[in-house]
Structure formats: C-alpha cells, structure tokens
C-alpha cells in the first residue's frame, strides 16, 4: 500500500520506481510536485462518470504504450455501458441509498461517480440532488427518502454491521424487500 485518499507515501513510491503514478484531484499538490521532482510521471484522473473511466483506461494505455491491447477492452466496456443504458430505458428506476459510513453517516451526492454508475444501472441516488460530494445525512432523512435498496461502500466479505442495523426499520422498502 502506498497511500490512501488523504495522503501518499512518497518514500515508498520512490523506492518502487514506478513508470507512472495515478492520482486523483484531491491528492496533496505538494506531494504530486514532489513525485514529479523525482522524475516520476503523474497522471491525475477525475472520473465522475462511467464514460470517464473508459476514457481513463484509453489514456493510461496510451501512457503505458499498450493502446493496441487496451482497444478491445475499451470497446467491450463501451458496448456494455450502451447495453446497460438501453436496458435501463425499459426498466423502472430503483431508489437507492448508498451509505459510506455510519458515524457520522454520510452518502454520495450529485458530483460522484457512484451516482452516475447507479443511474447507468437503473438506480436513482436518493441524495443525488445534493451538490456535495459526500454529504452527511440523518437516519430521519434516509427514512423520509424511502430507498428501495441500501448499499454499503464495501464488499460483501467486509459487510459492516451498520448495514444490518437498518433492519430496525421494516417499513423502509429496502428493508422490507431484503435489499441491504
């Protein structure tokens, strides 16, 4: 591991002698400058939609000199997104609450990739109108939003206990349907 959302370990990265480091816009600018001062190329991605991801794969393949190998992968990704968009047009939208943590409880807002990915899959982020990347929300706000599915920001193997805590509200459509 060479870092997280807040900071990167410059010494570890330099020791690994990478050909390229991929960052996001919230990486500390001084750390990005420090990497560049060591002659390490840095690519910053700000993927906010599934289409941005395919564009990034294309750009990274170009930077890595593997465009030919990446072309069929990118084409398959774009075809899959087109198929999802077509399928979504004939399906009913599902109201989704994407919970990132519980203390404090926060979710994803409008400018997030997760909101766009949910939309592509036929979901509607119940807090997708909030123009904040990770807004704090209350239990009452979630109950009022009546989500039909509640997602946790982790994989099933590390399922957080707070996801099951929603079972205390059986009137919430997501709980009634077992969509936790």
PLM features per residue range, with description:
Residues 1-180:
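N-terminal ligand-binding lobe of clamshell/alpha-beta domains
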């Amino acid at each position: 591991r060479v870092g997280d959302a807040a900071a990167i370990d410059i010494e570890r990265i330099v020791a690994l002698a990478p050909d390229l480091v991929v960052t996001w816009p919230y990486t500390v600018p001084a750390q990005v400058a420090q990497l560049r001062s060591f002659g390490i190329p840095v690519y910053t991605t700000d993927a906010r939609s599934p289409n941005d991801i395919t564009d990034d794969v294309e750009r990274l393949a170009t930077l890595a000199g593997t465009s030919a190998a990446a072309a069929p992968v990118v084409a398959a990704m774009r075809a899959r997104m087109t198929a999802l968009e077509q399928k979504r047009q004939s399906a009913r939208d599902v109201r989704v609450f994407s919970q990132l943590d519980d203390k404090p409880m926060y979710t994803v807002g409008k400018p997030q990739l997760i909101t766009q990915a949910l939309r592509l899959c036929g979901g509607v982020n119940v807090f997708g109108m909030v123009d904040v990347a990770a807004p704090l929300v209350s239990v009452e706000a979630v109950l009022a939003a009546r989500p039909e599915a509640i997602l946790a920001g982790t994989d099933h193997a590390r399922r957080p206990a707070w996801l099951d805590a929603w079972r205390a509200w059986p009137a919430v459509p997501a709980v009634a349907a077992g969509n936790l």
